[in-house]
Amino acid sequence: MTESRWYSTSPPAKLNLFLELLARRDDGFHELDTVMVAIDWRDELHVRRTTNPGVQLSVDWTDGRTSVAAELQVDEDNELLLVPTDDKNLVVRALNRLTETLRLDGGWEVQLNKNIPSGAGMGGASSDAASALQLGWAAARETQSDLPETLKNETLLSLAAEIGSDVPFFLGDLQADRLVQCAHATGRGEKLNFFTLANPLHAVVIYPAASVSTAQVYSRCQVPDSPQSSNELLRALQGIAAESEFSLHNALQAPARGLSSRIDPALECLSKAGLTHCHMTGSGSACFALADSSQQAAIAAETLRSTFPGGALIRPVMSCVVPSEIHIA
């Protein structure tokens, strides 16, 4: 085989606008009712096929490790900045599984530039994995022209669900071949009903220099007797009901607050900044609040950078489409 060109994209993060536990499954997971929106806090991923077997992954921080460490007020070797380059990284796992499934020769060279923090509940690792599958498929098609394009959707969706519950969301609506920003997810998060937002969503996100274990958060959860429903939120986001009628919810927020003392200050500061619907995303520790406009979000984020107690990554964000555009060099 010959080496392919470089394929690149910008994997986005996500926010859980709603997350409720419906039941505990026999496989250890929970049945969920969750609403996810992709946001423009992005990593950068570059992939190409090589003649050398395996996945050679290089990782760096886009803004530089020194700069990010200064924002977080931690040392440069702090675990918050450490990103694995072996099969603990979902990018490596995704490309290895793609190689096995398609029976490809050779391997992969990958450059991952991080912006999305780990242990934040923002789906950064899952988004990177989904993008790796998309880029890997495109690169494989370049060097193996007999690879049927008709197998793409089935293959990528199957591998994505195998790699992680959030990974299929970041592939977007492959079946309908359309760009979307939002999805209502059920099952363990892999059963997706995609939709387009009636209006762009603006928010401010705080990652309060703390990583929270997803497994520990879920282990402290209890399934409510009367779960809340996402129906009103879904209607509002799609423009079917007035936006003033919706409320956000995260069943994981209370147990996560018990695991990290950094979550409460983030929620409190977001509320004091004049933003609305302050909540944690996913299993934490990142928290967010909604803004009326990109200008309000930018002003609030700037204020929070000077008032938040301790280190944090604070960003104004807005909704974006999935999947991200692929570039070839």
Swiss-Prot record:
It comes from the Bacteria. It catalyses: 4-CDP-2-C-methyl-D-erythritol + ATP = 4-CDP-2-C-methyl-D-erythritol 2-phosphate + ADP + H(+). Its EC number is 2.7.1.148. InterPro entries: GHMP_kinase_C_dom, GHMP_kinase_C_sf, GHMP_kinase_N_dom, IspE, Ribosomal_Su5_D2-typ_SF, Ribsml_uS5_D2-typ_fold_subgr. SUPFAM superfamilies: GHMP Kinase, C-terminal domain (SSF55060), Ribosomal protein S5 domain 2-like (SSF54211). Pathway: Isoprenoid biosynthesis; isopentenyl diphosphate biosynthesis via DXP pathway; isopentenyl diphosphate from 1-deoxy-D-xylulose 5-phosphate: step 3/6. Keywords: ATP-binding, Isoprene biosynthesis, Kinase, Nucleotide-binding, Transferase. The active site is at residues 14, 166. GO terms for biological process: isopentenyl diphosphate biosynthetic process, methylerythritol 4-phosphate pathway; terpenoid biosynthetic process. ATP binds at residues 117-127. GO terms for molecular function: 4-(cytidine 5'-diphospho)-2-C-methyl-D-erythritol kinase activity; ATP binding. Transmembrane segments: none annotated. NCBIfam families: ispE. HAMAP family: IspE. Catalyzes the phosphorylation of the position 2 hydroxy group of 4-diphosphocytidyl-2C-methyl-D-erythritol. Belongs to the GHMP kinase family. IspE subfamily. This is 4-diphosphocytidyl-2-C-methyl-D-erythritol kinase.
